[in-house]
């Protein structure tokens, strides 16, 4: 093959297509679809993906540039993933390069560097020449200041300095230095004997190697530790020819120091067996089917997953298990590693870039056959997939909010169709869309209505916080919750307290004039964080110190409103001074391994109360937890989002599911200011069916999913009028060109009307069947492409929005 079609690493509308490159003779027969290459593009060299190799090019009459270099020896993307990338960019209206990069770990994304080189015979002033190394090269990033940059620029224009563009990977393979003897044991003994007393450390190394088996290789760090020596001693012995060194690649394994207790399959209950049987039959017949496994919390869904995977692996096939990021607890990893050992790769955001890269390479090299991971693990480069499982399928974190804005569930179904294998969606509170599909027979519904071993569902009490206020209780803890906490701790049992937000106090307010500090770049109030006494914007990252006086009226009466985890922790220590509390939130778990340490400490009984935000709502299973308290059930209910009632019911049901999962019965106390709302009322009886009927009636009335599909077009500009006018034109174009059944809402200012100094307007498109919608939206992007490329106007399109803010 003589030519390669390459998608280059440039995210603009004009360049969103394959370019032809000539394959040089020395790379012929080596370049394959799915490989990464370095190609010249304009004045620079950039990374690209090979989408096809072919005999001839339509441009063969013109001068076609050559592929510069090959970055891979085997394709990093399989043929199936290459096809999937086209579907993904089409479905999400994203650039082809963006879709391709979404499938790979960050380590494989290119790092670009400009290198400056002194031209032959150039005469440079000493202050410039001094900056260049012995090889007469200098990295652009190493230029010390603007004055030097100006000087260098002049010499580049004169031709004294050449500029070249380099492409590198972000992470390298981890290589470990190994040491072994370079002589026989007799020779080593003889040399050791001839050494003086001053060379005792050299003797120690030689004696150690004499005691080891012949030809053994030992990591240099281990050798130094065992013989109490340094690398300088090793270097001396290498120079003497007695030792030799070699470098071997090792994986960065986040679990290498952990022992996983081997587990055996558990006997299934009759209900579990009835749910497992249809999955087993589908696996045996190699057909594609989507199952919705609707099982109450603690009903044994994980055991069904494990036994299904066992079947898949026994057939020599591979499996993907997706778990929400916050459910990827050590407990969850233990379940899969305990059953399948070294066949498991784990991928989540807690791993370093290098660790993620190494887990991906285990999959790519076919060294593992099961991946357990968060959203992006759906792109694991398996070529013989036998099953995909999505646990907690209702979780909104399966939807990516940046381009490409894909939903992992849709990608899973697409991949499973290709591999002719089943998808299992599991949840105690499925999305209305999934449950409606199961009711229509698009998915097959499997139900688990009881907890395993006949354990009862926890008793749920609702506490009306308005009544508490009327009765003079101004505390964030109701009388009932305080009594239950004291009783639980007195019995030596544990409690989980859940708060539906993060941070210390939600906002700061002046009690005299009502002023609330807003982010200067976004239309959103700043969040107060007590550690460091800072106000932070969670949208753009802006930070500032807490004001001591009001910037508006100079009053000193500044008050902190809201109840964040830090504040709750302080209150707890006042009202229950002897209680041991572990707080889990973004601040306490930001350091690597902190999440695991805190959960292990709680599991070992080192605390009475686990206090936290969303991250403690799922996947935790502690036998001694008998009480769950929800401090603020209403937070998610009052967000301007058509899914707010659904999210509230899901969250409260999931949190309630943490109580009484073993022998001891559980109790849940939910504090609320809106106890009559059906999403809160129905949590009491764990009644998903009734909630589904209620919410479906509301969605039908309001023309929301699953009755209609949604698309969201958001326009932003630094000038409010430009954003509004552009959004108005887009809405007008859509209204004129969409079908009569399609509804266009807006344009209106987005709920958060300004982020990072850009004003935001949005249009919501509600449609049942709109075959031309994708083409119409592409036309809009095409029409505004110049303004978009110049960053004047930004238009984002979300074909299945989960965030309406």
Swiss-Prot record:
The keyword ATP-binding applies. It catalyses: Couples ATP hydrolysis with the unwinding of duplex DNA by translocating in the 3'-5' direction; ATP + H2O = ADP + phosphate + H(+). Monomer. Component of the replication restart primosome which assembles in this order; PriA, DnaD then DnaB. The preferred DNA substrate mimics an arrested DNA replication fork with unreplicated lagging strand. Interacts with DnaD but not DnaB. Interacts with SSB (sbbA) via the latter's 35 residue C-terminal tail which tethers PriA to ssDNA. Colocalizes with DNA pol III subunit gamma/tau (dnaX). May interact with RarA. Initiates the restart of stalled replication forks, which reloads the replicative helicase on sites other than the origin of replication. Recognizes and binds to abandoned replication forks and remodels them to uncover a helicase loading site. Promotes assembly of the primosome at these replication forks. Serves as the initiating protein for assembly of the replication restart primosome; binding of PriA to an arrested DNA replication fork with unreplicated lagging strand triggers assembly. Sequentially DnaD (possibly as a dimer) and DnaB homotetramers bind. One of its GO terms (biological process) is DNA replication, synthesis of primer. Belongs to the helicase family. PriA subfamily. This is Replication restart protein PriA. GO terms for molecular function: 3'-5' DNA helicase activity; ATP binding; ATP hydrolysis activity; DNA binding; zinc ion binding. Its EC number is 5.6.2.4. GO terms for cellular component: cytoplasm; nucleoid; primosome complex. Changing residue 65 to A: Hypersensitive to MMS. Its cofactor is Zn(2+). PROSITE patterns: HELICASE_ATP_BIND_1 (PS51192), HELICASE_CTER (PS51194). ATP binds at residues 295-302. It is found in: Cytoplasm, Nucleoid. A motif (DEAH box) lies at residues 391-394. The keyword Lyase does not apply. Zn(2+) 1 binds at residues 510, 513, 550, 553. Disruption phenotype: Filamentation, slow growth and poor viability in minimal medium, sensitivity to rich medium and to UV irradiation, does not replicate some plasmids. Residues 545-699 form the Helicase C-terminal domain. InterPro entries: DEAD/DEAH_box_helicase_dom (IPR011545), Helicase_ATP-bd (IPR014001), Helicase_C-like (IPR001650), P-loop_NTPase (IPR027417), PriA (IPR005259), PriA_3primeBD (IPR041222), PriA_3primeBD_sf (IPR042115), PriA_C (IPR041236). Residues 167-253 are annotated as: WH.
